[in-house]
């Protein structure tokens, strides 16, 4: 499959995705991303949006690192986008000046409370994954940059 010019937006929860879908004109129930998951996909000529879908056992949105990784991997494989945007709601820390409704652009991304106290596994446990440098974009739009953990 040839890479596309599409942008992939990954959102965990339907309630987070709905306003984005409305704004982008991505209507309907979407399509099932794969036979092995409940993830849903909507697309137009330039944007592809996926959600993790509903957990069949508990009947709630599939949230967390495992559904996010599986959905993102499957969507990247299916779409081969030029860029992936992980968007949605997350917690913040008031002591770090976080506030409800604030947009924060990631300058680093790591696992929250995922420490492994075995020699040589400390860095692996934390993750500290690279992200695209969007500092200039954040400044231009008036958004803050900061660390994002999952």
Model-based region annotation:
Residues 5-28, 43, 47, 55:
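Short, conserved "active-site rim" segments that organize catalytic pockets and cofactor/ligand binding
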Residues 3-5, 34-150:
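Glycine-rich phosphate- or other oxyanion-binding loops that anchor nucleotides, phosphorylated ligands
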């Amino acid at each position: 499959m040839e890479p596309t010019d599409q942008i992939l937006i990954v959102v965990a929860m339907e309630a987070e995705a709905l306003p984005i879908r409305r704004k982008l004109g991505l209507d309907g129930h979407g399509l099932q991303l794969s036979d092995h998951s409940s993830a849903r996909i909507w697309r137009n000529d330039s944007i592809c949006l996926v959600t993790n879908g509903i957990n069949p056992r508990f009947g709630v949105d599939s949230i967390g690192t495992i559904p996010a990784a599986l959905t993102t991997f499957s969507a990247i494989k299916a779409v081969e986008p030029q860029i992936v945007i992980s968007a949605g709601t997350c917690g913040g820390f008031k002591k770090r000046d976080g506030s409800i409704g604030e947009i924060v652009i990631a300058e680093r991304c790591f696992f929250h409370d995922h420490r492994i106290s075995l020699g040589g596994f400390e860095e692996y446990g934390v993750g500290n994954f690279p992200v695209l440098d969007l500092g200039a974009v954040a400044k231009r739009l008036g958004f803050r940059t900061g660390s994002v953990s999952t």
